[in-house]
């Protein structure tokens, strides 16, 4: 576990040893009890050749350490090293470039003075980096028996009505892809952002899953950090576990996200829309993202890499595809109701839209499909020709830009000769470009939890289809009532359509009488056998209700942009991409103005084999649609008070445990199935992926001599170990666009890469593809020069701004003020202070400006700041943009005669 790496003072006592020595010893037996492997331990003390058994037997290796004071020992199966004196795992590293001449005879370690090398960028751009033994991270399924019994069963203490947090943390902790990332790639939990939630979460996971774990821990640091950012969780009142999950995952994503730059050609046939204001019709309301599809900016502009092609017949005749689509469409009324019911989620959340980018494009063809891609704060609306659905093209728009407001390009004159040549003038946002760069962000959170939904609305008059892509992190499913179940179960008929606003039993408007009757009904239901009331609600029923098709007619007609009228329509919804871990939220709570209610209906859910094939889009590339349950969060009590617990399956021994704050108890599968589920975590199931991991694990024992060694991303290896579909090998997280290591990552390159033997690389590459192949690590000289230029630019811009602003503050009565958007200024400030690596785009004052009588004035209540004319000219000469928003203080004209009269009166008064 790389997360436990630290300096061990006993490393100096290790003798010289080779892999061949360890392999030979692994075929032997314990020198005391003659027990053979696996899991024998070899002493690493210099000139000591002792081999003993582990805790699964008599544990002679520990006895040997106590008697001889030989503290370091290596497991001959996993090649992990343990220090008895430090009671922790240690790592034996060596430097790059010092490989022996015979690649098949390599020392397992070359000890460094401080355990981990401190990086400085050398002048010859040769990267010296410790090499972590690959065996530390590719022991896929080999674990010691003592670890199987102990790890991951640590409770969490309640620190004041925090059972909601404890249950959520335990549920996440038992999601192997996320937990293994923090345990195996802990060095990547780096952030300069406060309150550094990822570091607190890393510390918590280390405590929960450490071999020497305590009975329970107190998650104080993590909780304090979340309360600092989100005031919803301050105080000691009971909160919602689902809200906490969303907040935590959003924070982790923000701190761990990495930007991926993509360059696209701008087809000249696509024209940018001038404004989005003209499109605020009823269809815009229809496409508002529901709470269940609360997208993060984690995978912004993912449409660039995700195909959602549909052939012409399927797209144009969507309404006729009844047999396969009758239960795979979502009710748009439920979308709006979702937002209303869960409005509380958005009130306490963070500013999640700072990475959102609005893009719009039009193809002026007769038959087009409107594609609307949702982000947190903006919608992506594109008209795509039916024949081009397989390759959607997106173009930046000037959303919200008033065409009457001018945005000036950078001034051509060199107003600031002192600026270095790195201050290249940027192009105006409105100027045409041949190529553009999309800002796309990814993190371990988006890799694991993000999926994509396709919503389609078809006009029944002109057959025009509007397609909406939404990125979801969880699915919020309604719990259907008895009448809704009957409709769902009878929907096999092609024309059977679930009415808008279904699941009325759960979400119909309630008054005080209905509220009282609901409680009476629940009491009666609890006293009468379930067979008396009808069929049991299953998770498949909830999914079918969520994806049910909806007929848009009457008061709920569809505003067709082609017909320019309200028309009858039909809406469908399917999943384009399933996430590796599917988070399902059952909507048990309904919040009204004066009171809240809870739906206590039992929902039956499978522990294994959840089949989501009926809800998958036809053209989806997803191959695995079967899920197994990992954990479930349960709520006991009413809407106003109650208690949260979690049932989790331990990934090491496949047993189920109940996590009730600091109490951890083993339970049966029937106990889990009878639970009142609130949030469920399902993981993709793939026997083929498990076989592939076992095959690669077996190859480690072959030890074929090779002349080349390959470097591979730790993050991708974590995917290979824990994902059902890891995807192509991606080494871009430690490489720049030039193929070298970025200078800023040189200091911790050992946390990013591992060295693979050639036979392992060949097998992985032939199976998954991707790359690029890397045999040599070096610091990129080009990036180093660019980084130095950027740093010099930051320093120069900051110094000039401070000087100009100081002069502006000393002015008594400036004649003019220039207003600047604080949103843009904050981005610029983050850049010059080194918090953001990329400079901001052109100055964008469109949100603070308004045009009246042909003059550009400041919008009332706008988020703006005031700077001097010199400061404006300085920033505008570098970044361009606009428009200019100028404030001129009113000038008071004083009558000279009145002034003389006042002076005369003052003189006479003094004389008296």
Swiss-Prot record:
Keyword Zinc-finger annotated: yes
Modification after translation: Ubiquitinated via a VHL-dependent pathway for proteasomal degradation.
Every USP domain range: 154-685
Biased composition (Polar residues): 284-296
Biased composition annotated in UniProt, kind: Basic residues: 422-433
Positions with a binding annotation for Zn(2+) 1: 8, 10, 83, 86
Disordered: region residues: 274-334, 403-433
InterPro entries on file: DUSP-like_sf, Papain-like_cys_pep_sf, Pept_C19_DUSP, Peptidase_C19_UCH, Ub_carboxyl-term_hydrolase, USP_CS, USP_dom, Znf_RING/FYVE/PHD
Localization terms from the record: Cytoplasm, Perinuclear region; Cytoplasm, Cytoskeleton, Microtubule organizing center, Centrosome
GO molecular function annotation: cysteine-type deubiquitinase activity; cysteine-type endopeptidase activity; zinc ion binding
GO cellular component, one term: perinuclear region of cytoplasm
EC number per UniProt: 3.4.19.12
Assembly: Interacts with VHL, leading to its ubiquitination and subsequent degradation. Interacts with ARRB1 and ARRB2. Interacts with ADRB2. Interacts with DIO2. Interacts with ROBO1. Interacts with SELENBP1; in a selenium-dependent manner. Interacts with CCP110.
Record's function text: Deubiquitinating enzyme involved in various processes such as centrosome duplication, cellular migration and beta-2 adrenergic receptor/ADRB2 recycling. Involved in regulation of centrosome duplication by mediating deubiquitination of CCP110 in S and G2/M phase, leading to stabilize CCP110 during the period which centrioles duplicate and elongate. Involved in cell migration via its interaction with intracellular domain of ROBO1, leading to regulate the Slit signaling.
PANTHER family on file: UBIQUITIN CARBOXYL-TERMINAL HYDROLASE, UBIQUITIN CARBOXYL-TERMINAL HYDROLASE 33
Protein name: Ubiquitin carboxyl-terminal hydrolase 33
């Amino acid at each position: 576990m790389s997360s436990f790496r630290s300096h061990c003072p006993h490393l100096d006592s290790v003798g010289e040893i080779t892999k061949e020595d360890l392999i030979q010893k692994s075929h032997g037996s314990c020198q005391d009890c003659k027990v053979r492997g696996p899991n024998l331990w070899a002493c690493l003390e210099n000139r000591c050749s002792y081999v003993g058994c582990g805790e699964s037997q008599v544990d002679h290796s520990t006895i040997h350490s106590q008697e001889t004071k030989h503290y370091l020992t290596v497991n001959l199966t996993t090649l992990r090293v343990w220090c008895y004196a430090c009671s922790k795992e240690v790592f034996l590293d060596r430097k790059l470039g010092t490989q022996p001449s015979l690649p098949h005879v390599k020392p397992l370690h070359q000890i460094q003075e401080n355990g981990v090398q401190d990086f400085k960028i050398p002048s010859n751009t040769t990267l010296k980096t410790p090499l972590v033994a690959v065996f530390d991270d590719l022991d896929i399924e080999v674990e010691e028996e003592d670890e199987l019994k102990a790890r991951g069963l640590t409770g969490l203490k309640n620190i004041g009505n925090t059972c909601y947090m404890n249950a959520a943390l335990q549920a996440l902790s038992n999601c192997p892809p996320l937990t293994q990332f923090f345990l195996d790639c802990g060095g990547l939990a780096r952030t300069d952002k406060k309150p550094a939630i990822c570091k607190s979460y890393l510390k918590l996971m280390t405590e929960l899953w450490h071999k020497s774990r305590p009975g329970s821990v107190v998650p104080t640091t993590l909780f304090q950090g979340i309360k600092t950012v989100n005031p919803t969780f301050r105080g000691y009142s009971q909160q919602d576990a689902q809200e906490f999950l969303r907040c935590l995952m959003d924070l982790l994503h923000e701190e761990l996200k990495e930007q991926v730059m993509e360059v696209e050609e701008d087809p000249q046939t696509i024209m940018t829309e001038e404004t989005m204001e003209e499109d605020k019709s009823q269809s815009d309301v229809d496409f508002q993202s529901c709470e269940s599809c609360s997208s993060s900016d984690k995978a912004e502009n993912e449409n660039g890499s995700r195909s959602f092609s549909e052939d012409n017949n399927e797209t144009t005749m969507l309404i006729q595809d009844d047999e396969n689509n009758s239960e795979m469409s979502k009710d748009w009324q439920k979308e709006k109701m979702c937002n209303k019911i869960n409005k509380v989620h958005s009130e306490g959340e963070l500013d999640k839209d700072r990475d959102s980018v609005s893009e719009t494009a039009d193809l002026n063809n007769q038959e087009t499909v409107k594609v609307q891609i949702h982000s947190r704060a903006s919608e992506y609306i594109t008209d795509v020709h039916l024949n081009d659905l397989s390759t959607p093209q997106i173009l930046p728009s000037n959303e919200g830009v008033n065409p009457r407001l001018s945005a000036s390009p950078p001034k051509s004159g060199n107003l600031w000769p002192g600026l270095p040549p790195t201050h290249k003038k940027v192009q105006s946002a409105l100027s045409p470009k041949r190529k553009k760069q999309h800002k796309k962000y990814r993190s371990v959170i988006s890799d694991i939890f993000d999926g994509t939904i396709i919503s389609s609305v078809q006009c029944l008059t002109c057959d025009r289809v509007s397609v909406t892509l939404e990125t979801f992190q969880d699915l919020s499913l309604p719990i259907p009532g008895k009448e809704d179940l009957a409709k769902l179960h009878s929907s096999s008929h092609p024309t059977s359509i679930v009415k808008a606003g279904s699941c009325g039993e759960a979400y119909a408007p309630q008054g005080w009488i209905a509220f009282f009757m609901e409680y009476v009904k629940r009491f009666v239901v609890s006293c009468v056998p379930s067979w008396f009331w009808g069929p049991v609600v299953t998770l498949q029923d909830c999914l079918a209700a969520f994806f049910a098709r909806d007929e848009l007619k009457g008061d709920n007609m569809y505003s067709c942009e082609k017909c320019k009228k309200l028309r009858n329509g039909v809406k469908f919804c399917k999943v384009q991409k399933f996430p590796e871990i599917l988070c399902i939220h059952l909507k048990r709570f309904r919040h009204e103005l004066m009171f809240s209610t809870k739906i206590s209906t039992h929902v039956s859910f499978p522990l294994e084999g959840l089949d989501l094939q009926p809800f998958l889009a036809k053209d989806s590339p997803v191959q695995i649609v079967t899920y197994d349950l990992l954990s479930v969060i349960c709520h006991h009590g009413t809407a106003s008070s109650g208690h949260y617990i979690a049932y989790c399956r331990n990934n090491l021994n496949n047993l189920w445990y109940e996590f009730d704050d600091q109490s951890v108890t083993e339970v049966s599968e029937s106990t889990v199935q009878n639970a009142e589920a609130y949030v469920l975590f399902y993981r993709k199931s793939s026997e083929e992926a498990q076989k592939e991991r076992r095959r690669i694990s077996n190859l480690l024992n072959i030890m074929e001599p090779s002349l080349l060694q390959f470097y591979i991303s730790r993050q991708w290896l974590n995917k290979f170990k824990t994902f059902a579909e890891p995807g192509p090998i991606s080494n871009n997280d430690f490489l720049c666009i030039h193929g070298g290591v970025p200078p800023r990552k040189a200091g911790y390159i050992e946390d990013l890469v591992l060295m693979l033997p050639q036979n392992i690389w060949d097998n992985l590459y032939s199976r998954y593809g991707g790359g690029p192949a890397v045999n040599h690590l070096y610091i990129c000289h080009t990036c180093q020069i660019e980084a130095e230029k950027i740093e010099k630019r930051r320093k120069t811009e900051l110094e000039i701004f401070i000087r100009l602003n100081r002069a502006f503050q000393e002015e008594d009565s400036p004649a003019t003020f220039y207003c600047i958007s604080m949103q843009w200024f904050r981005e610029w400030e983050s850049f010059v202070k080194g918090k953001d690596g990329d400079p901001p785009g052109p100055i964008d004052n469109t949100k603070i400006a308004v045009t009246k009588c042909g003059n550009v004035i400041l919008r009332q209540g706008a988020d703006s700041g005031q700077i001097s004319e010199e400061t404006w000219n300085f920033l505008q000469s570098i970044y361009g943009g606009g428009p200019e928003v100028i404030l001129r203080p009113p000038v008071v004209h004083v009558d000279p005669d009145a002034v003389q009269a006042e002076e005369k009166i003052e003189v006479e008064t003094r004389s008296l």
